[in-house]
């Protein structure tokens, strides 16, 4: 028999055993590995659980540089979380997948995955094989998704009647920092999406929706601008602050005299040479300005800078200009104004000019901050949501909240079917899965019942976060759903006196809810199939 370790004695002569390679042992196998994975996933899910619903709490995340972010957006919390365990990293990826595909429901998907693993742990303790649990979960997920199709309702996606879209956006924004003015934010999000939406293809190009923010003012001062906002001002303080009926030259070429492409050297040996060079530069600038004016342009927007002499000449020639405008903004301005980006000065013609009814410089409070607003554009399919707020953190959180709302409205344009929130859809699915489990003759029925119990964790977390007794509230809602045959009954988180989520207008998209169940189940199946953790350099012992 091989030696297990080394026998040693302490200072009092008492023997103890130093087990061989104990300090280097990090490999986990079998049930021990599964329990470790489940524990890590549960830790992440429990962190997220308190952020669920309209009464969910925010998290303060501090990064390595000391920058603070306050948010209750699941994807943001997890992306900023410092996690070492590989399974916890998978939970972060799960949330990111939900965010990339749907844009909302990132907290719920993690809480559901954590609940499924918690239930799986109890089944493992009872001796059920992980593969049987995974198969049972797969069957249950199929039943739940089919049931969601049966209980879903269709909403009218119409530009003239936007109320159903606004109510769905309000549900998403209800748990965010903007919930004090979530009606206004929902209307802004709906109007922005419907402005840029391509109803024939049933799709929305988010590149056409720009979200800008500026510290100062209140959240209620947030507005939708049918045009583009650029964080720049006119290049000279004496240029006019407002240009009406603007014909815009959009330049990506440097506003300076042409230079040879090859390496060159200019010898200036006298004052006359220097004056001649200065005169040449001035003539060239005047020629360029004249070329712009001949096309009919009365505003130049330049991606590159120009020196003070050129700036002064622009002022003398009554040609307002903006310099150092970034590439994405240049593209948006071109789309909005119907202009063409000009990469070479020689290619500038009247046909390539953009048009805007009004270009004006706006200033904020007592600060020197200024921004340029380009509105009444030729093509109104480019919009900007301009957010105001008391501090940078509120503005950043409002941006994240609006992103979720925009995604939800886009999903409704793609598929106009909805289910009811407040845990109503999960409770109804749990009842359907339980009924189906009773018909299952194999061992998988235990996993299906566990799946039903895990689905009920969402409504229980909602009631817990709202200060109610979770078990009592959940029992009442479940009993009423069975008795009244009404799948729209959920948790009355806002204490409005009714559990009917249809009356409360708590609406969630069907594709978002389906994706939550599918992704959480796939993730849990994958974790249940891992029984060994190997790291580089480990021996076979």
From Swiss-Prot:
Record's catalysed reaction(s): ATP + H2O = ADP + phosphate + H(+)
Family matches, as InterPro entries: Chap_CCT_epsi, Chaperone_TCP-1, Chaperonin_TCP-1_CS, Cpn60/GroEL/TCP-1, GroEL-like_apical_dom_sf, GROEL-like_equatorial_sf, TCP-1-like_intermed_sf, TCP-1_chaperonin
GO BP, sorted A to Z: positive regulation of telomere maintenance via telomerase; protein stabilization
Keywords, sorted A to Z: Acetylation, ATP-binding, Chaperone, Cytoplasm, Cytoskeleton, Hydrolase, Isopeptide bond, Magnesium, Metal-binding, Nucleotide-binding, Phosphoprotein, Ubl conjugation
S-S bridge residues: none
Origin: domain of life: Eukaryota
GO MF terms, alphabetically ordered: ATP binding; ATP hydrolysis activity; ATP-dependent protein folding chaperone; G-protein beta-subunit binding; unfolded protein binding
EC number: 3.6.1.-
Annotated GO CC locations: centrosome; chaperonin-containing T-complex; microtubule
Residues involved in ADP binding: 53, 105-107, 175, 422, 492, 508, 513
Modifications made to the protein after synthesis: Ubiquitinated by the DCX(DCAF12) complex specifically recognizes the diglutamate (Glu-Glu) at the C-terminus, leading to its degradation.
SUPFAM superfamilies: GroEL apical domain-like, GroEL equatorial domain-like, GroEL-intermediate domain like
Residues recorded as bearing N-acetylalanine in the entry: 2
Residues modified to Phosphoserine: 26, 346, 539
Glycyl lysine isopeptide (Lys-Gly) (interchain with G-Cter in SUMO2) crosslink, residue number(s): 20, 210, 214, 265, 275, 279, 392
Predominant localisation class: cytoplasm
Binding site for Mg(2+): 104
Family per record: Belongs to the TCP-1 chaperonin family.
Function comment: Component of the chaperonin-containing T-complex (TRiC), a molecular chaperone complex that assists the folding of actin, tubulin and other proteins upon ATP hydrolysis. The TRiC complex mediates the folding of WRAP53/TCAB1, thereby regulating telomere maintenance. As part of the TRiC complex may play a role in the assembly of BBSome, a complex involved in ciliogenesis regulating transports vesicles to the cilia.
Protein name: T-complex protein 1 subunit epsilon
Native source organism of the sequence: Pongo abelii (Sumatran orangutan)
Species classification: Eukaryota, Metazoa, Chordata, Craniata, Vertebrata
């Amino acid at each position: 028999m091989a030696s297990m370790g080394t026998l040693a004695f302490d200072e009092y002569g008492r023997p103890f055993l130093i087990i061989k390679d104990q300090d280097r042992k990090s490999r986990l196998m079998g049930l021990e590995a599964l329990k470790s994975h489940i524990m890590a996933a549960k830790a992440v899910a429990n962190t997220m659980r308190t952020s669920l619903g309209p009464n969910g709490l925010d998290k303060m995340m501090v990064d390595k540089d000391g920058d603070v972010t306050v948010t209750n957006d699941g994807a943001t919390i997890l992306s900023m979380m410092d996690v070492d365990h590989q399974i916890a990293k998978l939970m972060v990826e799960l949330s990111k997948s939900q965010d990339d595909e749907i844009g909302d429901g990132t907290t719920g998907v993690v809480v559901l995955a954590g609940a499924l693993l918690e239930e799986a742990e109890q089944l493992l303790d009872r001796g059920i094989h992980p593969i049987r649990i995974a198969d049972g979960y797969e069957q249950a997920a199929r039943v739940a998704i089919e049931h969601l199709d049966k209980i879903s309702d269709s909403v009218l996606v119409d530009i003239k009647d936007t109320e159903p879209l606004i109510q769905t956006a309000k549900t998403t924004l209800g748990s965010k920092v903007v919930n004090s003015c979530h009606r206004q934010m929902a209307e802004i999000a709906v109007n922005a999406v419907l402005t840029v939406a391509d109803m024939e293809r049933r799709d929305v190009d988010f590149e056409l929706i720009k979200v800008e923010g500026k510290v100062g003012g209140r959240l209620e001062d947030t507005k939708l601008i049918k045009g583009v906002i650029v964080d720049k001002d006119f290049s000279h303080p004496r240029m006019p602050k407002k240009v009406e009926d603007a014909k815009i030259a959009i330049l990506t070429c440097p506003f300076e005299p042409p230079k040879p492409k090859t390496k060159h050297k200019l010898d200036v040996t006298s004052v006359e040479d220097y004056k001649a060079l200065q005169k040449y530069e001035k003539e060239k600038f005047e020629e360029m300005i004249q070329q712009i004016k001949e096309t009919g342009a009365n505003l130049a927007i330049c991606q590159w800078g120009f020196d003070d002499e050129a700036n002064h000449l622009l002022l003398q020639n009554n040609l307002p200009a903006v310099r150092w405008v970034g590439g994405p903004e240049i593209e948006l301005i071109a789309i909005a104004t119907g202009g063409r980006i000009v990469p070479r000065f020689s290619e500038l013609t009247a046909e390539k000019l953009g048009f805007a009814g009004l270009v004006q410089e706006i200033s904020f409070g007592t600060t020197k901050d200024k921004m340029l607003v380009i509105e009444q554009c030729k093509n109104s399919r480019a919009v900007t949501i301009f957010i105001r707020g008391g501090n940078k953190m509120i503005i950043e959180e409002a941006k994240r909240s609006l992103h979720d709302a925009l995604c939800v409205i886009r999903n409704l344009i793609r598929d106009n079917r909805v289910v009811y929130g407040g845990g109503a859809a999960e409770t109804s699915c749990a009842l359907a899965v339980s009924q189906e489990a009773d018909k299952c003759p194999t061992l998988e029925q235990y996993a299906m019942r566990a799946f039903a119990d895990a689905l009920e964790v969402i409504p229980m977390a909602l009631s817990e976060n709202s200060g109610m007794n979770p078990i009592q509230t959940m029992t009442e809602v479940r009993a009423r759903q069975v008795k009244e045959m009404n799948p729209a009954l959920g948790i009355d988180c806002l204490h409005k006196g009714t559990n009917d989520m249809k009356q409360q207008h708590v609406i969630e998209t069907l594709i978002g809810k389906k994706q939550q169940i599918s992704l959480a189940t796939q993730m849990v199946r994958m974790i249940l199939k891992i029984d060994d953790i190997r790291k580089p350099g480990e021996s076979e012992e």
